[in-house]
């Protein structure tokens, strides 16, 4: 850190590698003073306008709000609040088109102005030194201030993280990108307030040196800042050569100190903190005037805009309304850019609102804009590498991005790319390198975010498993303690431990089983040891007697049911014989004889069946005997009918 200060105090300027000198085109907008646009009727305030997380809503649909009233609140310094740009009614809270080249929607508050522009109650102060550094940081946070130089990183978080490390505080007034002049005009017209904001920040951080760096193409701004200092030596002014991108953080630090910020680290790691001049003005307004960040200076430029210049624009104002108020000549063949020509983003929808990020709206005509030429193959001319101010190898990163070799992209320090656009500007093959690098960064971020969520889920799962195991162990311990308490209670009341008694019974049972399974032996007359089968033979005999007894019971049951059925069968057979005999005596004709013989045959069959039934009565079960008797009765009945018919015929 001492090396940083010694190099800075030498007064020397170092030149960084690469860089370009594109046409500045700043005279279009820097000749007119700051102006205000008419107050609009509808404002669209995105819930997140900074690099961080979205705040929590404080309002709902239908609420009436005042100018400067907080619409969201945060839980930390990286969750900045947003504020009402004017007084009016909340019409809706829903997705609305974002100020982004994707044209996607984002959660947005729709505020309809009442035209009164009535402020919320404010508490301005004259002397900021009456507040502690912590109180000042809190006021900066409550005002929703983010870096207005393009990064939109929460200012309070940046200050707090570097509070004990800063030796050199750099205020960036370089404004190196073509067309943009908002910082230039702000320094010319509000130099006193900018100096006041710088002194507030110096009071918080206590750096050893404070410097304002301004490019040499802004002589009016340099003069205004020096006049505002009035000879004070607590803040110095350092004029740097005009070169793009000298306003980038790492490049400006190298210009002033000759020291490079290590890859992957912040400038605070070498004792340097940098802030934009617009951010210093916002800090002064927040601390002294108690005004949140609800407006900023925006450059309106390009040949398609009639009233070029720099305007105070309320955050949330639709871009289409701003352009209309500035005399924009709509032409579908020419896009609108948010930002400058090098790092700006093409807007697909002009209904998108102005946010804290927007410092310029560029509307070029055919003299300033041409359709992108067809992309050609890389010829490896090294023009991009020679011009890169970060010492990267854009052609190699291009191949890695095309092949989605994310590991190689990271190895070649893609994260250090500041997206200045120089590589694409100098490429003779018209390769849109910045688009490839932005897409590759987004893919790597998605992969890491997915891995981060996976790791977090794994940690949560393992924590849950550990908790469940701990709870199970605690449950078992409670059960064991309760069981022990019950045993002790029973032991006190009955005089013995029930568990021990149960174990003793179990041991005794096992011992008996062991004895019963031992093989008994006896000694023969010859002295041989033979197995003693006495018990086994007794068991077999008992089983045999049990089977015989069961069979005898079944036989007795059958005999009790058979006599009745057999007697009925004998009676039926006797009746049948009597009828057949009578029929034989009565019939003298051959037909009668024949029928008599038939009847006798039937009788014989019946008799035989009955005799067979009688013989087998002991072998058949009662059910079969009954069936046989029924069949015999049916045959006898049929025979009787035949006899009656013959007698009638003889008469």
Curated annotation (Swiss-Prot):
Top-rank taxon: Bacteria
Keyword tags: 4Fe-4S, Cell inner membrane, Cell membrane, Electron transport, Iron, Iron-sulfur, Membrane, Metal-binding, Repeat, Translocase, Transport
4Fe-4S ferredoxin-type domain span: 368-398, 408-437
GO CC entries: plasma membrane
Positions contributing to [4Fe-4S] cluster 1 binding: 378, 381, 384, 427
Main localization (coarse): membrane
GO molecular function, one term: metal ion binding
Cofactor note: Binds 2 [4Fe-4S] clusters per subunit.
Role, per record: Part of a membrane-bound complex that couples electron transfer with translocation of ions across the membrane.
Documented EC number(s): 7.-.-.-
Topology in the lipid bilayer: Peripheral membrane protein
One GO term of the biological process aspect: electron transport chain
Organism, scientific name: Haemophilus influenzae (strain PittEE)
Pfam families: Complex1_51K (PF01512), Fer4_7 (PF12838), RnfC_N (PF13375)
Cofactor(s) needed: [4Fe-4S] cluster
Segments of skewed composition (Polar residues): 554-564, 587-600
Subunit field text: The complex is composed of six subunits: RnfA, RnfB, RnfC, RnfD, RnfE and RnfG.
Disordered, as annotated region: 465-565, 583-624
Subcellular location: Cell inner membrane
NCBIfam families, per the entry: PRK05035.1 (NF003454), rnfC (TIGR01945)
Official protein name in the record: Ion-translocating oxidoreductase complex subunit C
Family, similarity comment: Belongs to the 4Fe4S bacterial-type ferredoxin family. RnfC subfamily.
